[in-house]
Amino acid sequence: QXGDLVAAGKKVYRQCHACHSVGEGAKNRVGPEQNNLFGRVAGSLPDFRYSKAMKSAGENGLVWTDKSLHEYLKNPRAYVPKTKMIFAGLKKPEDIDAVVAYLKTFDTDGMPDPDASTYTPPNG
């Protein structure tokens, strides 16, 4: 169920919260804020200092989608070599599915996205 997946994602996202924020009033921290992430070109928030690697990835066509975020969260440094993100990655596919579902619930202003209730993980 999408609601259960989102609730699980909120718990898993606690690992991300030290560096990132999401939701109403989200601000850039060590990592960029993550409202309205899906469809965003990687490295494109104007007021965040990205690594050269992340900016280059975006310039070369990396856009955050369900699939690209799944791959990135598995192993950030393998997906975007030389990224500044120090997190090693999420090992469990179900945790990645949950975080993706959770992040999809936030629109540009950090408010609930009505389309998020239709999210189905690519793995099932």
Curated annotation (Swiss-Prot):
Binding residue positions for heme c: 16, 19-20, 85
GO BP: photosynthesis
Highest taxon, organism lineage: Bacteria
Pfam families: Cytochrom_C
PTM-bearing positions, type Pyrrolidone carboxylic acid: 1
Main location class: periplasm
UniProt keyword list: Electron transport, Heme, Iron, Metal-binding, Periplasm, Photosynthesis, Pyrrolidone carboxylic acid, Transport
UniProt key word Electron transport: yes
Subcellular location as annotated: Periplasm
Gene Ontology CC, one term: periplasmic space
SUPFAM superfamilies: Cytochrome c
UniProt-listed InterPro entries: Cyt_c-like_dom (IPR009056), Cyt_c-like_dom_sf (IPR036909), Cyt_c_1A/1B (IPR002327)
Gene Ontology terms for molecular function: electron transfer activity; heme binding; metal ion binding
Post-translational modification: Binds 1 heme c group covalently per subunit.
Transmembrane segments: none
Role: Cytochrome c2 is found mainly in purple, non-sulfur, photosynthetic bacteria where it functions as the electron donor to the oxidized bacteriochlorophyll in the photophosphorylation pathway. However, it may also have a role in the respiratory chain and is found in some non-photosynthetic bacteria.
Family of this protein: Belongs to the cytochrome c family.
Name recorded for this polypeptide: Cytochrome c2
Organism: Afifella marina (Rhodobium marinum)
